[in-house]
Design a protein with these regions (language model features):
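S-adenosyl-L-methionine
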Residues: 1-49, 87-120
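Conserved class I S-adenosyl-L-methionine
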Residues: 50-59
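Glycine-rich SAM-binding Motif I of class I
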Residues: 61-65
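Conserved SAM-binding motif I beta-strand of class I
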Residues: 74-79
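A short SAM/SAH-binding and catalytic strip from SAM-dependent methyltransferases
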Residues: 122-135
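C-terminal substrate-binding/active-site "lid" region of AdoMet-derived donor-dependent transferases
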Residues: 135-194
Length: 202
């Protein structure tokens, strides 16, 4: 199923990559997770309607709409780029016109990832290599503080992952590797074409 087709099904516009580069070396270029990758993730990993996913560096919001459409899950998109944030909000309006009662379950915030205040309902955190490991460490520490305040099992989902992220999670946190999801046909050519899911158990 191609990218344009899925966008049409969801009544959103997310195809295309960022032109140019961010001013800070800590933040990487926007590129949406391929729909084929998200399909494979859900083939092997369960997202429930009771879950609330936070996508850091959400761009135009593809993951939010996809997870709501497929699983009924709530989703929060965090995006520092004002243009992408506006496009995500436009997508939300378009999606809401076709999918009733979805606005309460999909939201976006325009802020730096480390400034997002983790909500006690947030339990799935998604990263498509959006920023440097220094920013990632700050975000993970915010997640851990939230779990200390409101105990719950949380998962971190990494796509096209950075070795620095893995090293930090495995050596400096209590997160444990729960699952690896390789993208058939793509992983064989590029070892980064996979998801790693880390969990923090109660």
């Amino acid at each position: 199923m191609n990218e344009q087709y899925y966008d049409a099904v969801l009544h959103i516009k997310t195809v295309g990559e960022q032109k140019g580069f961010n001013k800070s070396m800590h933040y990487h270029r926007y590129e949406p997770t391929p729909y084929s990758g998200l399909d494979e993730l859900l083939n092997q990993y369960e997202i429930r309607s009771s879950d609330r996913i936070v996508d850091f560096g959400c761009g135009k919001g593809r993951l939010n709409f996809y997870m709501h459409h497929k699983c009924g899950a709530s989703a929060v998109g965090i995006e520092m780029n004002e243009e992408f944030y506006k496009e995500a909000m436009d997508n939300r309006d378009r999606y809401a016109r076709k999918v009733r009662n979805s606005k309460d379950k999909i939201r976006f915030e325009c802020c730096l990832a480390q400034e997002y205040e983790i909500d006690s309902r947030d339990n799935r955190f998604y990263f498509f290599n959006p920023f440097s490991v220094q920013v990632f460490m700050n975000v993970v520490n915010n997640i851990l503080l939230s779990v200390e305040e409101t105990g719950r099992e949380v998962d971190i989902i990494l796509y096209y992952l950075s070795e620095d992220y893995i090293f930090f999670l495995e050596n400096q946190t209590a997160f444990e590797l729960k699952k690896e999801v390789r993208l058939p046909g793509a992983y064989e050519k590029n070892g980064n074409e996979r998801f790693l899911i880390y969990t923090l158990r109660l």
